[in-house]
Amino acid sequence: MKKTNNIKKETMFQAQNIFLTYSQCDLSKEEIKTFIINLCNEKKLQINYLIIGIENHQDHKGKHHHVFFQLNKQFRTRDLTIFNIPKNIKEKKLIDHENIKIKDFFYSPHIEPRPGNPIKDTTDVRNYVKKDGDFIEEGTFKHVRYIKLSKNEKPTELESLTNNYFLKLRKEYQQKEINISKTKNEIFKKLKLYAESLEPNYAFKNAKRFKNMVFEYIFESDIKELPIFDFCTFKKIPILISIYDILETQKEQLSNSISKRFKTLIVEGNSKSGKTQFFKSVLTNLELPFNYIKDDVDFSDENYDEDKCVNIYDDIDIYDIQARNLTKVVIGNQKDSIVNMKYKPRTKIKGTDISIMLVNEDTSIEKYCFDNFKRGRKEYKYIRENAIFINLDKHTITHYEYQKYENEQAVIQHFEMPKNWDGLLYFLDQENES
């Protein structure tokens, strides 16, 4: 019996994204859809996405039906005739006769992927099926890009793609006003994810090279730093005045060489509420040089200066701090601590440094302490005794945004009433601090 598929029967076909073309096919899209669904059900496979489109050829070659579907796991078979659709279901039994040709009674598709002809980009396939506008689709489409390399082939195409993407990211971030450390970390993560979408093994093997690319070829001159707003642009509401007074008192103690370990200011509030700009403005106004550490506890030379007396930790998860055993370094400022950074010289964190933590609602340390207390743990006690909690809630604190609140007294009253979590956390007022 003659077979129309070129792949030998003993060759294992296995694919999660499958593209079929039924040439000169008179079946409807719904009939093909039913066939594909039943076939996958027999294989106990779930269809995540399915699209069927009709292409009308003007050269009298009839209609082509293009079928593309994505599965929850690989479709495996050694017999590709399984994709043949009977022209008339009653005539299926005639396949057993030796003199019967498959093409006379079955629509036999061209199948991809196949040796030497992989599906390189699922988006391209999807667009091809849609090109004539006569299609049906259902499910959730997933973009996947494949680049097949032989064992001895150098990944020049992958390198070219990742290098170009890196340059694109670098150019994009040059247009933004953003912190240099955050920029490097974000670009590295995006570059790694992009490489994984191309070829997971390639991404895994080249992760170190990607990191070197980012940290060696992005310089501070490439990135625009956020401008620091003048202190007068912030409203003189009670909670902000109290923060200013606390920092001013701590500055006086530093100036008088008073050996005192400061409690950490933990400031929680909604994202984009102006927390970062306020503290940068206050510290600049007080002439207190500061380190700004964002997203990751990075005490490397590029991100941390031991001579600066204030450390701002912005949007760093308390669980990450604990995992690195840095809780008593970041919060409460123990005696001088030595921090070991991987592949970096050891860094000294002075016990007399002023420590400020800026936290968004999704990484609330206040909520962490409450949950820790309910579970009968004791970690919350150290944080409670070595931190001043200030909650800015959802109200913006910059002058430019403040005008949208019509009732200024209501806003001021709100800021004077921080959350307390049933007495678990206490707030140190100005008198106790001094």
Swiss-Prot record:
Domain CRESS-DNA virus Rep endonuclease, residue spans: 12-141
**Residue span of motif RCR-1:** 19-22
Gene Ontology biological-process annotations: DNA replication
Reported function: Introduces an endonucleolytic nick, thereby initiating the rolling circle replication (RCR).
| Similarity section | Belongs to the geminiviridae Rep protein family.
Q: Where is the active site?
A: 128
Identify the taxonomic lineage of the organism of origin.
Bacteria, Bacillati, Mycoplasmatota, Mollicutes, Acholeplasmatales
Recall the GO molecular function terms of this protein's record: ATP binding; DNA binding; endonuclease activity; metal ion binding; nucleotidyltransferase activity
How cofactor binds (record note)?
Divalent metal cations, possibly Mg(2+) or Mn(2+).
What does the comment on domains in this protein's record state? There are 3 rolling circle replication (RCR) motifs. RCR-2 may be involved in metal coordination. RCR-3 is required for phosphodiester bond cleavage for initiation of RCR.
**Sequence motif: RCR-3, positions:** 128-131
Q: Which UniProt keywords apply?
A: ATP-binding, Covalent protein-DNA linkage, DNA replication, DNA-binding, Endonuclease, Hydrolase, Metal-binding, Nuclease, Nucleotide-binding, Nucleotidyltransferase, Plasmid, Transferase
**What is the protein's name according to its record?**
Geminivirus-like replication protein
In the Enzyme Commission scheme, what number(s) does this protein have?
3.1.21.-
